[in-house]
């Protein structure tokens, strides 16, 4: 969102999806095969790929509109909490996925 010439990322730390799975399910499947990763996604994606199967959790236009209006009930998840969730789930790592990873910057 552009507010008076300053860009704000409304979805930083807002998780739209989270799942524990095998690294082989990710595009980096050859990195550390046999390990488990906690996959997390956030709303917002600058790509519009034909056939995207993550529209509701990546584009999330309704969710982003609610965030912009200050009407969202989505909770901010601090990095430390996300790391604890990964450790507690037995994950070997965290994969930022489901949307364009730069939304986490």
Model regions and ranges:
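Conserved Radical SAM active-site core
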Residues: 4-105
């Amino acid at each position: 969102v552009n507010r008076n010439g300053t860009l704000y990322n409304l979805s930083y730390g807002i998780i739209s999806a989270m799942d524990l799975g095998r690294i082989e399910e990710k595009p980096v499947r050859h990195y550390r095969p046999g390990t488990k990763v906690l996959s997390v996604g956030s709303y917002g994606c600058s790509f519009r790929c034909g056939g995207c199967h993550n529209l509701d959790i990546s584009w999330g236009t309704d969710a982003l509109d609610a965030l912009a209006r200050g009407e969202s009930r989505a909770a901010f998840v601090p990095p430390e909490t996300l790391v604890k969730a990964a450790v507690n789930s037995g994950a070997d790592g965290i994969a930022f996925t489901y949307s364009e990873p730069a939304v986490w910057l």
